[in-house]
Every structure is written in C-alpha cells, then in structure tokens.
Curated annotation (Swiss-Prot):
Similarity field: Belongs to the class I-like SAM-binding methyltransferase superfamily. Cx-SAM synthase family.
Catalytic activity: prephenate + S-adenosyl-L-methionine = carboxy-S-adenosyl-L-methionine + 3-phenylpyruvate + H2O
Pfam families: Methyltransf_25
Protein name: Carboxy-S-adenosyl-L-methionine synthase
InterPro entries assigned: CmoA, Methyltransf_25, SAM-dependent_MTases_sf
Quaternary structure annotation from Swiss-Prot or TrEMBL: Homodimer.
Source species, domain of life: Bacteria
GO annotation (BP), single: tRNA wobble uridine modification
Organism: Pseudoalteromonas atlantica (strain T6c / ATCC BAA-1087)
Binding residues for S-adenosyl-L-methionine: Y39, G64, C65, S66, D89, N90, D117, L118, N132, R199
Its job: Catalyzes the conversion of S-adenosyl-L-methionine (SAM) to carboxy-S-adenosyl-L-methionine (Cx-SAM).
Amino acid sequence: MQSSKDAIYSQPQQVSDFRFDDTVAEVFPDMIQRSVPGYNTIVDAIGQLAGRYATNNSNIYDLGCSLGAVSLAAAKYVVADNCSIIAVDNSEAMAQRCARHVKAYKANTPIEVICDDLQNIHIENASSVVMNFTLQFIDPTQRDQIIQSIYDGLAPGGIFILSEKLRHASEQGNELLIDLHHEFKRRNGYSELEISQKRESIENILRAETFEAHQTRLQNAGFDDVVLWFQCFNFASIVAIKS
C-alpha cells in the first residue's frame, strides 16, 4: 500500500475534529506506521489468529477496515474452505481505496468491502470478528450493544480481536504512557507542532478506556476468556474467546 507522507498537521492551522476523509485516506498507511507502535506486528498476528480459528463455511468480519490491512492479512493465512471476509468502513474514502487494494491483491479468500456504519451489519456465522482501533471512535454509550451483537454472531469457538488505545487507570501511569508515545512519534519524524495539533484534533473523538473496562464489557457479553496478547505503551490488542 503506497501512500504519500503524512504532513496534515505540519503547518499551523485552525484545528478541527479528526475525520477519516480523502486527505487522511491518502496518507493513512504512513500515518498509522509512524503513529501506532507495533502496527505491522498487530496486523500480521491478527491475520494469523483469523487463520487459526477459521472454520469451513464461516465468515470473518473486519469492522472499521480502513484500507484493508487486516482483511488482506486474514486472507493470507486462512486455509479453511469456503470462508468469506467482510470488510466494513463508514468512510467512503477509506472503503473505496480498500476495494482497490483488495482487487489488486487477488486473495484466494473472497473479501467483500462494504461502506456502511458497522452497527448496521448483522454478524452471523462468524469464526472471527476484528475491530482494529475502531471501537475507540464510537460513542461509549453504544459500545456494550456492539460487543454483545458481536458475541451473539460468533460461532462457538470463535474469537473477537479488539485493538485499542488504552487509558491507564492512574493519572501518573497515563501521562507516562502518553509521553512515551509522543517520543515514539518524534523518533518517527513528527514535529512538536504536528504532535500537538493531531492530539487536539483527535481528543474529542477518540475516547479511550482502561483495559479493565474492556475486560468487564467482554465478560459481561459472555466471553469466557479475555487475553491481552499485545501491548506497547498505550496501544494494545485483546483476543476474546467464545466457548
């Protein structure tokens, strides 16, 4: 996935709320690589997990698919027969580019790209459902119902993979993780202005929760095992298993 370099916040500007529009979609691969520690590791491992748990004739859902990195990783590892991958994003700019990437990749496992709100998608016969840094952008009052519908749509033995930016339970710990993340971004070429303006643009729409809050929600939905399998600074990925 080739893209332009992310310079969206390189000049002083009147900062508005972050949106997944054409401007962001154009630079998204560069932005995500330079902003999320361990992103490639997370995506590849999600693909492995989807392949490991895929069963014949099942569905794999990538909710908030952006440009399709997770869907393509899953397609790479799935060997079960007659599986389908459903990639969903409510950003037309993202979904259009995702469809182009999928077409160019020519995966053996079919990938259907849908531009819609993930809450309009009926999850059924799923061996895996993935939300890779997606739930954090959804109204917290709607999150319980979303997770419950995912649990209900998973087949027994299926998994839900949830990657999120976390908020630490203590203010001191939270500030430490934020500082480490900002240093990560500096080392990846972002200026102080870019870091500050990006933080201002996203603070009203990315509402992070603690790991404990996610764990409680997943357990309340019915998941028997909740495993924190990856964390770097305040970025983490969780796999929840349905018996």
